[in-house]
Structure formats: structure tokens, C-alpha cells
């Protein structure tokens, strides 16, 4: 009888410890994701907490990027994320290279491109990453204010993500990868397009 009680107690404490640990991880993840609203990760990055744990700060992805748009986060963002890879969507954007050199360079698999069922079956169907969210700012976008523009037309590499109606652009958020190329092409001042982190609540 005593053995049964001891066994039940041990099981209870194991469950309690497991739940406590799970709660700690969830809180840490929530805090990290709140901070992650201030940056964008390179293509095919793991979820933020997994990325932080996997990224070795080797800088190989940045070296491999032919467009020099990957950079290490500065220490001002916190020691836990310092030197981890981030994407400069404000001054260049991800060109989504066909061979994904940054992903290939990541031996730690912090950047890991999934293989679709179609690709697995030998079909040439591209898999697009989800890096950020892009949106049209109608108050600043020139065609919404009167004059014609079209500067961003043709900038988007994903079919159907950036479309035009009556010469006014719109973004299909379900298709958009958040690469930032439309933002780079925008000639309005201030910019008529905004690109924000997936973790930013708006």
C-alpha cells in the first residue's frame, strides 16, 4: 500500500514538473516572439525559438547571399539573439534565388527548405517561404492618390501575389512571401508599401 502511494506521488510530481517546464517554455517563447516583431529572418527559417537554438551564428548564410541582404543582428537586441541571421527587407529584400544558397549554406538546419509532395514526385513546383507580411499603404501609394506609377509591377517573383486592378496594386497575403522586393521597387516617398515581421501584431 505504501509503495502504491509513493508511486502515485512520484507520478504526480513528474506530471507537475512536466507541466511547469512546459509553461516556462511557452512563456519564454511568447517573450521571444514579442521581441521578434522587430526583425525578419532569412527564407525557410525555423520558428523563432527553434531558430535561436539551432543557429550557430556562423554567418555562412550571409556569406552565401549574392545580394548581401542577410546580416547578423546587433547585440542591442539582446545577447540571446545577437549575431543570429536576419534579413534586410527595408533596403534590398530577399531575391529568392532559385538554388537558395543561404539555405544550402546552413549546416545547422536553422534554415531548412521543405520538400513538397509535388517535388517529391518529381514535379517542378516551387515551394515559397513565408518571411514577413507586406501591405499596400493606400495613403502613400501613388496610384491610390491619383498619378499613375507601376514601379512595383513585375517586382514580385510569386505569381498572383502582387496584382493590379485599375492600375492600383494589391497584395494577396496568402501568397505573399514577404520578400520585400516590391518595397525595394517602390519610388514613393514615403514608401507606399510596408513589410513587417510575421510576429508583429497589427
Question: Can you say where each PLM-predicted feature lies in the sequence?
Answer:
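Non-ligating segments of multi-cofactor redox enzymes
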Residues: 1-202
Amino acid at each position: 500500500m505504501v509503495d502504491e502511494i509513493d508511486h502515485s506521488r512520484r507520478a504526480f510530481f513528474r506530471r507537475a514538473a512536466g507541466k511547469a517546464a512546459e509553461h516556462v517554455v511557452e512563456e519564454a517563447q511568447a517573450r521571444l516572439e514579442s521581441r521578434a516583431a522587430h526583425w525578419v529572418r532569412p527564407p525557410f527559417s525555423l520558428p523563432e525559438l527553434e531558430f535561436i537554438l539551432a543557429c550557430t551564428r556562423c554567418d555562412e548564410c550571409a556569406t552565401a547571399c549574392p545580394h548581401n541582404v542577410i546580416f547578423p543582428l546587433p547585440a542591442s537586441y539582446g545577447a540571446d539573439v545577437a549575431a543570429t541571421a536576419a534579413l534586410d527587407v527595408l533596403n534590398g529584400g530577399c531575391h529568392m534565388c532559385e538554388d537558395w544558397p543561404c539555405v544550402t549554406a546552413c549546416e545547422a538546419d536553422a534554415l531548412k527548405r521543405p520538400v513538397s509532395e509535388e517535388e517529391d514526385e518529381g514535379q517542378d513546383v516551387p515551394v515559397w517561404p513565408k518571411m514577413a507580411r507586406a501591405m499596400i499603404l493606400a495613403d502613400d501609394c501613388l496610384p491610390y492618390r491619383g498619378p499613375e506609377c507601376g514601379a512595383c509591377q513585375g517586382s514580385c517573383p510569386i505569381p498572383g501575389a502582387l496584382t493590379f486592378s485599375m492600375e492600383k496594386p494589391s497584395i494577396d497575403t496568402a501568397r505573399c512571401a514577404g520578400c520585400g522586393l516590391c518595397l525595394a521597387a517602390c519610388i514613393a516617398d514615403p514608401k507606399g508599401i510596408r513589410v513587417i515581421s510575421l510576429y508583429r501584431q497589427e
